[in-house]
Each structure stands twice: as C-alpha cells, then as structure tokens.
C-alpha cells in the first residue's frame, strides 16, 4: 500500500489494520485489489490497457496479437492521436487564442469566415502553405530544414504515454513519467537549431533565450512533478491516474476526489507556473518577444516551415496541459462523460489559463525570467519535494 493510500484512508477515518484483522489478510488483499481495479475502470484508465491491445480485441485478434499486428495497430493509434491533437492545436489553439484574447480585451475576434469564424483556420492554412519556403543563402541548410520538424514531433511523441481514456493510451511503460518529460525536452534542441542555423542575430538570440529558459524551468518542473511520484510510489502514468480515482474525503455526503491538486496545492501552483515558462507563454515568452526580437527563432522561416513551428508551439501547450491533467487533475477520471471527453476538458481548462496569463500579465525581462527560475522556483520546488518526502515518510 502506497503512502497516499494510507493518507486517503486516514482522511476518511478508515482503519486499514482493523479491516485486515476482521476480514483476514488474504480477503482484505483481494478486496483492495478489486476496489482498485473498479476505481481504475471508473476513472477511464482501463486498467492500463493500451490502444493497440484495445483495437486488437475489437477486431477479434485477442489481447496479444503477433508483433506485426501490434506494430500496425500502434501506427494506427499514433495517427489517431496525432490527428486529434493537430486538429485541437489548429482550431481550439489558434482560433481559440484569437477568441479568448478578444474576450479578455473587450474586442471582436474573427467572425467573418464560416460560422463563428472557424474557417479562418482553413484560410490561414491555404495562405501559408501556398507560400514559397524562402531559404536565405547564408543558413546552415541541414539544421535549418530539420529544426521545424523536431518541435511538433517531440510533442506528439510525448502524447504516446499520456492516458487519454479507457484503452486510449498508446504505450504504458513503467517509466512513463520520465519518458514524457524526456520527449518534450527534445523541442529545446529544435528551437536552438532553428535560431543558430538561421544565421540571423534576432533568430540566434531567440534560440539562446529559448534554451536558457527551458534549462532554468525544466529542473523545477521535473522536481515538482517528482513530489507526485513520491506520493504515488510509481512512475507509471496509468497508475498515478488510477490512484486519483479514490475519494480523498467525504463531507456531507459529497466525496472530494483524491486529485493531487487537493493533496498538494502548493506543488500544483509551482508546476503550473513552471509549465507556463516551459511552453513559452506570457509572461515568459521572451524567446519570441515581438517588440525585441521580431519573431525570435522563427524570424527567417516562412511557408510550411513556419506552420510546423507555429503548430509545434500549440502542441506543446496542449502537451503541458495533458501532463498537468494527468499528474494533478485525475487525468481522464470523471463522472458520466467518457474519459477522453474529461481529458480534453481539463486540457482546454489549462489552455484557457495560459491565454488568460497571455492577456493579463505583462512580459518579464529575460534577466528577471532567469532569476525567477533559478532563485525562486528551483528553491521552492526542492523545498516542496523534501517536505513531501518527510510527510510521506511520517505517514508510512
């Protein structure tokens, strides 16, 4: 039994030892396993079943098809996830950004092309993709060409281990927590390459700022997330989500879920702030900073390359929202609606917060940004981790 389960049972006034003595060790163990399996299923986790396994069973090939079919089903799942989040990035991301910003600033957003202005995305895509990809003479061509693909690729790779709903997780490795942060950090290489390869001072400064910012905030981001792992006792994301399906406390007949945002709200605030800097949104958008660096590392890009970098930004915003939802908001767990719907609602809620910050909070200077990361968030994240470890050790 993990420390967090002990905490939940204590909060609900449950005495695990008495229950074990009354029922017998074996029976209590079986009952606990059954309850956990039921909670995991209700929370939309599906007991850790992956999408290839789900698709194989639906098509009548059983839970363990041969490696060739597993590869095919995995590619189908990867295509589905990529399609869902590319569409989300295009419509909820780019169109939503305009609508939300207009609402916060009391303006009228796009409303001419299609219903509610939705077809402006199609118009923008046709306009940008029909433009010539201009390659300046002095660029480092291989790095210049590769960089735009690394940014969206790293985000889509990170979604591979995110539990999106019942049977909608492409892979469920034991080290899924480590994998998702490692995959998302590949984007830093793409941003630096795009800035360096452009042979442009503004682009180079934007790339350096992006790298410095990601290093400064990646450490507190991971350290803060590690406090969730200390509580959960596992690195497997599906198990972290399943653990949040239990009731933390029941007040007047209303059960408060054991989401880690309620267990450790300080860690949630730290993680949300570090994530905001990690995805480069206001007030931490110094790598682009239009008033200072034109378009930062994207200055020399046009046409399809610009589209890839721009979509990559929004994909990373949604990946950050998915990580927040998985670690702190119960992932796909929720009543009545399917797990995938709850997951998208939570991701969009985090996205709404980033757009509020973009409209309401002014940009900080690069020196202030680095100071906040190294002297503020890093210290608080380690303090949070140590305090969490002490509490868990005391409970256990």
Residue ranges and their predicted role:
Residues 2-12, 40-396:
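Selective transmembrane helix interface/packing segments
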Residues 9-41:
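Asparagine/serine/threonine-enriched low-complexity, disordered tracts
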């Amino acid at each position: 039994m993990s420390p967090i389960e002990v905490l939940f049972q204590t909060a609900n006034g449950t005495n695990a030892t008495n229950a074990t003595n009354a029922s017998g060790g074996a029976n209590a163990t079986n009952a606990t396993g059954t309850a956990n399996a039921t909670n995991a299923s209700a929370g939309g986790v599906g007991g850790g079943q992956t999408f290839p396994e789900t698709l194989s069973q639906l098509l009548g090939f059983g839970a363990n098809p041969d490696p060739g079919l597993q590869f095919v089903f995995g590619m189908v799942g990867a295509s589905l996830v990529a399609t869902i989040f590319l569409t989300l990035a295009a419509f909820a991301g780019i169109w939503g950004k305009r609508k939300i910003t207009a609402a916060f600033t009391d303006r009228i957003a796009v409303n001419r092309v299609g219903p509610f202005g939705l077809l402006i995305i199609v118009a923008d895509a046709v306009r940008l993709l029909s433009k010539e990809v201009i390659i300046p003479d002095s660029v480092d061509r291989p790095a210049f060409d590769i960089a735009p693909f690394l940014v969206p690729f790293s985000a889509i790779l990170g979604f591979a281990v995110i539990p999106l709903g019942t049977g909608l997780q492409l892979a469920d490795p034991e080290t899924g927590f480590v994998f998702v942060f490692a995959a998302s950090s590949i984007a830093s290489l793409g941003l630096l390459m795009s800035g360096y390869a452009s042979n442009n001072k503004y682009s180079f400064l934007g790339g350096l700022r992006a790298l410095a910012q990601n290093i400064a905030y990646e450490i507190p981001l991971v350290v803060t997330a590690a406090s969730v792992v200390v509580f959960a006792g596992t690195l497997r994301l599906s198990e972290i989500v399943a653990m949040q399906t239990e009731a933390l406390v029941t007040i007047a007949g209303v059960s408060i879920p054991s989401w880690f945002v309620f267990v450790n709200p300080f860690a949630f605030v730290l993680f949300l702030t570090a994530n905001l800097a990690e995805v480069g949104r206001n007030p931490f958008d110094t790598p682009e900073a239009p008033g200072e660096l034109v378009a930062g590392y994207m200055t020399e890009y046009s046409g399809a390359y610009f589209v890839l970098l721009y979509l990559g930004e929004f994909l990373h915003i949604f990946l950050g929202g998915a990580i927040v939802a998985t670690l702190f908001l119960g992932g796909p767990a929720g009543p009545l609606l399917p797990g995938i719907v709850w997951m998208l609602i939570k991701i969009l809620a985090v996205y709404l917060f980033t757009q509020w910050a973009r409209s309401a909070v002014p940009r900080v200077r690069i020196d202030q940004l680095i100071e906040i990361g190294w002297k503020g968030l890093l210290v608080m994240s380690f303090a949070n981790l140590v305090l969490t470890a002490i509490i868990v050790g005391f409970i256990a």
